[in-house]
Amino acid sequence: MGQKVHPIGMRIGVIRDWDSKWYAEKDYADFLHEDLRIRDYVAKRLSDASVSRVEIERAANRVNITIHTAKPGMVIGKGGSEVEALRKNLNELTQKRVHINIVEIKRADLDAKLVAENIARQLEGRVSFRRAQKQAIQRTMRAGAKGIKTQVSGRLGGADIARAEHYSEGTVPLHTLRADIDYAWEEADTTYGKLGVKVWIYRGEVLPTKKNNVEGGK
């Protein structure tokens, strides 16, 4: 059976950049596990803040963390109290000086991670998987996407046999490297077990296409 490559991993170095930016030789494994601990902690502490991405940069004994969120006010807190508490806890976790940047996501409906989270939370609230997917597709297309594909898999509707159902609208050119495709997955904990949610969003081309030379032109 044919398998799909990760859409973001395939585009790194072409139109996408790494989420972790640092170089290490002997400490590579330690830094990698530290990155995982940072991401897990941020995801749990800011689970209601619509966090899409966490970028990590390292320089000497300093760690710069950039949090992309649709609700910056919830991350920052009143008078910056929440982000300051987050910084102190990350200082203790890493034993390094941590600097936190907050980047607001202007259009949450064009972010695959946030769309997948929204579908998963609806599934946990016993909303029909068909309705949750179709509503998400409508919102994303209205927000200006060129195409979207969603998939929900597991014991759909409490069925004994797990299956997958997907819906799509527009185009999602996975083989076109210049196509800006955002991909994410999320899990929904239901009374019948876990459901997997996958979302692909095509937001248009990034690199300008070369103009075709007119035959016989100057």
UniProtKB/Swiss-Prot annotation:
Gene3D superfamilies in the cross-refs: 3.30.300.20, Ribosomal protein S3, C-terminal domain (3.30.1140.32)
Coiled coil: none
UniProt cross-references to InterPro entries, sorted A to Z: KH_dom (IPR004087), KH_dom-like_a/b (IPR015946), KH_dom_type_2 (IPR004044), KH_sf_prok-type (IPR009019), Ribosomal_S3_C_sf (IPR036419), Ribosomal_uS3_bac-typ (IPR005704), Ribosomal_uS3_C (IPR001351), Ribosomal_uS3_CS (IPR018280)
GO MF annotation terms: mRNA binding; rRNA binding; structural constituent of ribosome
GO BP of this protein: translation
Domain KH type-2: 38-106
Assigned protein family: Belongs to the universal ribosomal protein uS3 family.
PANTHER family linked: 30S/40S RIBOSOMAL PROTEIN S3, SMALL RIBOSOMAL SUBUNIT PROTEIN US3C
Cross-referenced NCBIfam families: rpsC_bact (TIGR01009)
General function of this protein: Binds the lower part of the 30S subunit head. Binds mRNA in the 70S ribosome, positioning it for translation.
Stated name of the protein: Small ribosomal subunit protein uS3
